[in-house]
Amino acid sequence: MSRTRRRRPRRAGVMTAVLCTAAVSAATLPAHAAPQGRILGAGAPGSVTGSYLVTLEEGTAARSAAGRDLAEGYGARISHTYGTVLNGYAVRADARQAGRLAADPRVASVVQDTRVALDHTQRNPPSWGLDRIDRRGLPLDRRYAWPEPAGAGVTVYVIDTGVRTTHRDFAGRARHGWDFVQDDRTAQDGNGHGTHVAGIVAGTSYGVAKKARIVSVRVLDDAGSGTTAQVIAGIDWVTRNARKPAVANLSLGGFRNAQLDAAVRTSIASGVTYTVAAGNEGGPAALYSPAGVKQAVTVGATDRQDKKPAFSNFGSTLDLFAPGVSITSASAASDTARAAHSGTSMASPHVAGAAALYLAEHRRATPAQVANALVKGAASGKVAGRGLGSPNRLLQVPRA
């Protein structure tokens, strides 16, 4: 009996401790704790932090005192009340306040606000390629529409024969990076290929991304020839000096070279998006470098009828196609000259420009995310005679 009596206080003590713990735990719960509802579009591209669109259920009018009190009761500040096209309002609130508002049964939905921008249109673009990449199907409509900010803030590195940076179509947005042919800081173009490519990327008249910056990295001589060592040196320079967000275009290639492919992969891993020409041999792109690099965006060519020309390489290595026959762009002959050329060299810079458009609105996107967005946004089922294993995807520029 004595043992039993001595145990009771201990049991009581244990019980008291448990009850005290429970009491403390209950005391730590905030008095204002409330369920959190779902915020639609939270964190989506272009979302506006702290701004939400609220739609109310039919039983509560947004313009009524009850409607106003509903939002304000959760700490949200109404910035605009709708009453005709939408029974709701725009509010300023933090994420917790918005979540509590979304959980209220009188609220139909809470959607995070997003930014909207103009689509700018160029009438009668000088290149049919521009006309094609903003339309999911033929016929062409003699217009090219692109989203602002038109590639502003994005740098595109043209690893090529150099660029005539003084050409008027660049409007002061092109500069020299490095010349690995003559080993100096003036990467001028004595061939014309690089200037033509740069014009497709970012020319004011001829370009896809009309406000992107161009940096010339010369790795090919005036005859359009160079060594793998020079190309790798150019890629190495871009990787070390890239001003991000950044895109690099390689409208060049040769037979498979493990070192060149590794250099491109390493540069992509550093955060630079690469667009590369599939090649003009009319064979499998997988046989050539850097077209065979899986992490790069490899581009085949199409003509005005959405057909793959005989010269364009093909195969599963390709990510998509873009215009590449009789493409008009800037010429290195003078500061106002233009020329028309064909090749996957012309197709790839269309995609580089589209990548710049995307990065201007998604500045933290990784190269893989950029590639995925371009592939997903491409028009499917349009390319005729695309070649064994090739994807049936044709470039479309991102829309605002």
Tell where the protein language model's regions lie, with residue ranges.
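Primarily auto-inhibitory N-terminal propeptides
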Residues: S2-D119
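Subtilisin-like serine protease catalytic core
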Residues: R143-H176, D184-Q230, A242-V247, A286, ...
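C-terminal subdomain of the subtilisin-like protease fold in secreted/lumenal serine endopeptidases
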Residues: A34-A42, G46, S79, A212, ...
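Protease zymogen maturation seam
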Residues: P35-P45, R68-T81, L86, A102-T155, ...
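Extracytoplasmic/secreted envelope proteins and their assembly/folding machinery
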Residues: S64-G67, A71, A95-A98, L130, ...
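Solvent-exposed loop/turn segments at secondary-structure junctions
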Residues: E58-A61, V85-L86, R96-A98, T114-L118, ...
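Substrate-binding/specificity loop regions of serine endopeptidase catalytic domains
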Residues: R123, G224-V231, L252-A322, S326-A352, ...
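Structural recognition of the beta-strand scaffold that forms the well-ordered cores
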Residues: Y52-T55, A90, S109, T155-I159, ...
